[in-house]
Regions:
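N-terminal secretory/targeting leader peptides
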Residues: 24-117, 125-333
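Sec/Tat signal peptide C-region and signal peptidase I cleavage site
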Residues: 15-23
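Bacterial N-terminal signal peptides
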Residues: 7-16
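Twin-arginine (Tat) signal peptide motif
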Residues: 1-7
Length: 333
């Protein structure tokens, strides 16, 4: 019996010596997010997993937890800082409550007209500066992923600011977004993303804001009668990682993961617009939600009500940051 055990141990040692990788446990990256698999972010997370595992030849294992199955959006940031999860892709609105208020520049209504303008910021000096500010929070920023431009939804027709008066509108935790709703005469309601469907269904809130992909994949078209194509803001994600975990990775692994993330980012941003266009068409075909296209006059009224939110938040976000975004995009008040 002892001799058989000795032979087995020696054989195992021989395999380990012949192939050191076989003796090593893979590095596990838990990647948590709050949206469905069939959204731009959901698909990009799965693509990153595929690339990371293939390119590291199994030395890294990426476990993706979609749809708030591991943490809700109000919990995940603390979990990342504590090291309970290694990677997230939260909306950039989440960094304001963390104390990095400069990120709330992305929440300013009508600051971007299109993805090209957005990318001039995320790919430029402002995007890099914002990621540097996360380092003191035990967070390393890896990439910006697009979702899409937001539209307002409700259970009554919404075309101009007066239509929002007294309406309870769900928002992410962001002072800027709260000011946005107040500027329209509505009542902002901060709520976890995973709770929104039920809140809309039961009338706890009257409406919300989302890109079409989130609106459709979370089945909000089942509980919202109207969707106004306001394109009043963006939801942009930042892929972030626990700084201590990232810094301790072997240099070759880190380099490989950076390459995988770069390719996953291109994939995410390439599909974002199409995914939202497809989702909007699916909402249209489902026939449960009336889609409202604003006239030029209605759009002008919305902008007139919302653009002052920029000035209101200069001291909070930083006038210099807002000015740099204006300069990069050519924004004119």
């Amino acid at each position: 019996m002892k001799s058989r055990l000795l032979v087995a141990l020696l054989a195992g040692a021989a395999v380990a010596l012949a192939d050191p990788a076989a003796a090593q446990q893979p590095i596990v990256i838990k990647f948590s997010h709050v949206v469905a698999l069939d959204t731009p972010k959901g698909k990009a997370a799965e693509y990153f997993k595929k690339l990371a595992e293939e390119r590291t030849k199994g030395r890294v294992k990426v476990e993706v937890y979609p749809n708030s199955t591991l943490y809700k959006d109000g919990e995940e940031m603390e979990a990342l800082q504590l090291g309970s999860v290694q990677m997230l892709a939260p909306s950039v609105a989440k960094f304001g409550p963390l104390g990095v208020r400069e990120f709330e520049v992305f929440d300013l209504p009508y600051i971007f007209d299109n993805f090209d303008e957005l990318h001039k910021v995320t790919d430029g000096a402002v995007g890099k500066l914002l990621f540097q500010k996360l380092e003191s929070k035990k967070i390393t920023g890896l990439a910006y992923w697009d979702n899409g431009f937001k539209d307002f939804s409700a259970n009554k027709s919404i075309k101009v600011p007066a239509d929002y008066k007294g309406m309870k509108m769900r928002i992410q935790s962001s002072k800027v977004l709260g000011d946005e709703i107040k500027a329209l005469g509505g009542i902002p309601q901060v709520m976890a993303f995973s709770e929104v469907y039920q809140a809309l269904q039961t009338g706890v809130v009257d409406g919300t804001e989302n890109p079409p992909s989130n609106f459709y994949t979370q089945k909000m078209n089942e509980v919202q009668k109207y969707l106004a194509l306001t394109d009043h803001g963006v939801i942009e994600y930042a892929v972030i990682v626990n700084k201590e975990f990232w810094d301790k990775l072997p240099a070759d692994i880190r380099t490989t993961l950076e390459g995988a993330m770069k390719d996953a980012t291109k994939y995410a941003n390439d599909i974002a617009k199409k995914e939202n266009d497809d989702a909007l068409e699916a909402v249209r075909k489902a026939g449960k939600t009336q889609i409202i296209t604003l006239t030029a006059d209605e759009k002008a009224q919305m902008k007139k009500a919302l653009i002052p939110v920029h000035k209101e938040n200069e001291s909070r976000i930083g006038k210099d940051v807002i000015s740099e975004v204006y300069k990069a995009t050519g924004f004119k008040q």
